[in-house]
């Protein structure tokens, strides 16, 4: 761990000086829906909350949450939003509040809605990007453990034009870690904790002390049907990760999607209840050798059908959990 942190500091020191102060605004497509950044009450910690739906032209790709903490020695950012334009907007908000260097950006996981904004930070700061080992090398447009980068980028170039275009590129992490690292900066302690495989293979949470603020990433999604239809998803580990959130006893929690909360139990309730509901329905089907289509069509989804991303995510989620439970049964 100490070796990694020494490398981090060295890498930060060797990167070129920020271009922001000396360059004009970059050629990122302007947003027509500006981001809104709020402050954690009484703390030098800020966050942006995305729209609850899936990325599209109507929300300009702004569907995820991100935030940052300001210290006397620099800024630590958690996630970078889903387009270079959004990343630039977040960077500009930081510059309005402080002239401190942006030292680190923590990628909660390598999914497009959280990382395309890294391009703006790479182009206009010398921040070191930190991710979990299983994010993969994520070389430009290459396949990784979490999603096929090239396919996703092409899809977003169509769905999110002009904010994602032919100039948009995927920025890999500078440094990765396996389980946990701690960064001490300007009187704050940032604990980066691996929480995967859960929503992805590379989930990270970031606890900021002594403030007691937790950036939870996508293992916590408040009021939005999470995406689970991936080989990387493990709802068993996901539920364990939510237990870890409670064990951290945060005073304030900022989820990967949805509204923040000063009550951890309330913040995780939607995600936990949804996972448990789907698992119960699918486990009964698996135990009784009921095929998936019959199980899905006979399940009462009325509790969740009106939530954002239900139509796009729910059936795939149920199928992924069905397969997970089926595989678990065969291992017995």
Enumerate the predicted regions with their spans:
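Active-site neighborhood of phospho(di)ester-bond hydrolases with catalytic His/Asp-centered motifs
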Residues: 78-80, 103-111, 130-133, 195, ...
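Bacterial N-terminal signal peptides
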Residues: 8-18
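C-terminal regulatory/interaction regions
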Residues: 22, 31-32, 287-332
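Active-site HxH/HxHxD metal-binding segment of metal-dependent hydrolases
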Residues: 92-173, 182
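Acidic/histidine-rich helix-loop elements
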Residues: 47-64, 139-142, 146-148, 224-232
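Core dinuclear metal-dependent hydrolase active-site scaffold
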Residues: 176-209
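Divalent-metal (often Zn2+) His-rich catalytic cores of metallo-beta-lactamase-fold enzymes
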Residues: 213, 236-290, 294
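Conserved beta-strand hairpin/beta-sheet module of binuclear metal-dependent hydrolase folds
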Residues: 43-93, 204-208, 213-218
């Amino acid at each position: 761990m100490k070796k990694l942190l020494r490398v981090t500091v060295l890498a930060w020191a060797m990167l070129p000086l920020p271009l922001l102060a000396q360059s004009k605004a970059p050629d990122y497509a302007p947003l027509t829906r500006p981001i809104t950044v709020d402050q954690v009450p009484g703390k030098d910690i800020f966050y942006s909350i995305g729209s609850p739906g899936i990325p599209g032209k109507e929300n300009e790709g702004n569907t995820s949450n991100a935030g940052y903490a300001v210290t006397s020695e620099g800024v630590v950012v958690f996630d970078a939003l889903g387009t270079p334009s959004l990343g630039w907007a977040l960077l500009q908000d930081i510059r309005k509040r402080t002239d401190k260097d942006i030292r680190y950006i923590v990628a909660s996981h390598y999914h497009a809605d959280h990382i395309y904004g890294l391009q703006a930070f790479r182009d206009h700061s010398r921040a070191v990007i930190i991710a979990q080992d299983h994010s993969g090398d994520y070389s430009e447009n290459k396949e990784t453990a979490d999603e096929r980068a090239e396919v996703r980028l092409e899809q977003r170039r169509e769905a999110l034009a002009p904010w994602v275009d032919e100039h948009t590129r995927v920025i890999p992490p500078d440094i990765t870690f396996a389980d946990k690292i701690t960064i001490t900066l300007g009187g704050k302690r940032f604990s980066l904790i691996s929480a995967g495989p859960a929503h992805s293979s590379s989930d990270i949470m970031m606890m900021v002390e002594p403030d007691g603020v937790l950036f939870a990433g996508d293992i916590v999604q408040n009021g939005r049907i999470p995406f689970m239809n991936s080989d990387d998803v493990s709802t068993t580990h996901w539920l364990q990760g939510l237990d870890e959130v409670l064990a951290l006893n945060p005073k304030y929690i900022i989820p990967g999607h949805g509204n923040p909360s000063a009550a951890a139990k309330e913040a995780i309730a939607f995600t936990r209840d949804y996972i448990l509901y789907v698992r119960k329905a699918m486990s009964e089907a698996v135990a009784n050798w009921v095929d998936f289509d019959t199980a899905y069509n006979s399940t009462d989804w009325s509790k969740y059908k009106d939530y954002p991303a239900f139509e796009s995510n729910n059936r795939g989620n149920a199928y992924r959990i069905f397969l997970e439970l089926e595989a678990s049964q065969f291992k017995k």
